[in-house]
């Protein structure tokens, strides 16, 4: 039987926490193979341009005129704290958090960029917090937050089933964020993506007249 090998790219949150079930389901067929590259949005788009990927699932921004795309889902973005923190389960104002240590991903991270953009739109910046810690590992961030060292803002998928971590919300910060499936024009990538991810995603991809 002919084998089908997909070349998939994903940003870190999506590759590490969102696609696992889809990968398991897809590999349930003996004729299916895949390679998954987890990298930042910029590099994944470059790989699409060079035909090194069939499609990418990303949280970052991209040219909606250059690529075709569709919305995979809107992902909750949440504040996280230790389970026994007085912040846990509350709806807070940003002023309530400035005395905390803020733990963020490294420069260039999509998660960090989204948080910084929303902070700026609300009139704040990272240096308004008492202390800023930058860590590239989700595992380390979660361990420090669970240990009461500080707070962070991550996608819900990253902290699902984490019994030692609580969540909170903040107006203007913890709004859902889109995850998109992105692919080059004039390819069969949409069919491959829907075979891999399911075909019930919202159809918001860009259809040009010349396609």
Predicted segments with their positions:
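Secondary-structure junction motif
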Residues: 102-123, 190, 207
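A late-sequence structural motif
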Residues: 18, 169-210
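Flexible hinge/capping segments at coil-to-helix
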Residues: 66-103, 107, 191-193
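Hydrophobic hinge/microswitch elements
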Residues: 40-45, 49-52, 58-59, 120-168
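Short, well-ordered beta-strand segments
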Residues: 5-9, 56, 80, 103, ...
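Central regulatory/effector-binding core of bacterial HTH transcription factors
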Residues: 2-64
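Short beta-strand->loop
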Residues: 68-78, 156, 163-178
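Ligand-binding cleft/hinge of the Venus flytrap
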Residues: 22-29, 112-128
């Amino acid at each position: 039987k002919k084998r089908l090998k997909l070349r998939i790219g994903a940003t870190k949150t999506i590759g590490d926490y969102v696609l696992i079930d889809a990968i398991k389901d897809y590999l349930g067929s003996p004729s299916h193979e895949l390679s998954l590259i987890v990298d930042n949005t910029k590099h994944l788009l470059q790989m699409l341009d060079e035909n090194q990927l069939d499609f990418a699932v990303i949280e970052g921004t991209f040219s909606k005129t250059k690529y075709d795309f569709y919305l995979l889902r809107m992902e909750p973005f949440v504040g996280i704290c230790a389970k026994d923190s007085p912040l846990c389960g509350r709806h807070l104002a940003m002023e309530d958090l400035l005395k905390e240590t803020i733990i963020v991903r490294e420069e260039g991270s999509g998660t960090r960029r989204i948080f910084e953009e929303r902070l700026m739109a609300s009139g704040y910046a990272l240096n308004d917090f008492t202390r800023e810690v930058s860590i590239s590992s989700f595992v380390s961030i979660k361990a420090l937050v669970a240990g009461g060292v500080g707070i962070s803002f991550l996608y819900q998928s990253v902290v699902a089933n984490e019994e030692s971590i609580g969540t909170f919300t903040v107006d203007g910060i913890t709004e859902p964020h889109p995850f998109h499936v992105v692919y080059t024009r004039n390819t069969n990538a949409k069919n491959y993506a829907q075979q891999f991810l399911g075909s019930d995603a919202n159809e918001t991809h860009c259809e040009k007249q010349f396609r």
